[in-house]
């Protein structure tokens, strides 16, 4: 991997951060914002169809750029900005990471930076959120646009910024990065390892952050998405994009995993011990009255109040290997638990389970919806679990009424795109081209 990342941005202007004595800075601690420091809400899988979630999460389908490009989503978090600012968005933070950030900010030898892939349009709301928590980073960095209108991919932008930090702060000998996206964690590790080959004193640590997803209130989310579709449809004709409509009561049958299981898969992928998994689940869960005082349950996101659903008895699987497919799905190799003594799955001589075979489940990172197959299977990265690491995974079959987003009228695109267009850098209606011609 090359250490030089040319994205057409020139050099970063650190002078706007105020005076910093570069001779005193020995370490840099870089914090990601979304789902790392702050638990940004995701589209609720219990409300939307799979197609609707795909439309909302994509950056280049809706004219406003989708869920993570619309400042209204952050503004709608909890009970809204006016209420949440007074209570510092309580309950929406990863408090362990907040504590680490406070320590980084306190130390005079550390450059503490908040680095996000969001653009400058989010500066107002993001700075309001972190200020309410009393987090005074030396720098809050948003993705920049090149003079020619080019928007770099978030990963390349962050790597470019790392280089700029090392160029300006010459005495840094240690880097610590807090990040939640698996592909970024892997790329940062490879890039920093390559840097360490040329500079033996360039130590680094990457903290993989894994927290259960959080969601907006049902009525807030419905109103928000309706507004996003209205805004899109006003701009769509001039951008030659299709019009979309909100559709209610779509019957669907889906296979899902509970939120707690989604959290477990994520932590297992990042090699976080089981004890820490359960501690993290406990810290981010709502306790319900139970005969077992030690029983902790993660509350599932709320369902539409005016629609019904029913859940079939779940199926149990013995997880033998895990991996990922891009930043979209966790991949799970599993054996049906029927026929095995589940209490003995950790014993090597008893649980003779083929770890490289069995059923492959694709579990959506953001929603927990399970698919049985994906077209391009070459993008998987597998980690075989030792017997002591195996666990019993439950999947549920649910028939429900959900909401959907569909074409407002028949639409035939004049251009043909493949599923690889997202990673190939197709233009975003909001941000313009993501790669140079």
Swiss-Prot record:
One of its GO terms (cellular component) is small-subunit processome. GO terms for molecular function: histone H2AQ104 methyltransferase activity; RNA binding; rRNA methyltransferase activity. One of its GO terms (biological process) is box C/D sno(s)RNA 3'-end processing. The modification Phosphoserine is found at residues 290, 293, 418, 428. The keyword Transport does not apply. The modification Phosphothreonine is found at residue 296. InterPro entries: SAK_HAD (IPR018812). Keywords: Phosphoprotein. This is Uncharacterized protein C4.02c.
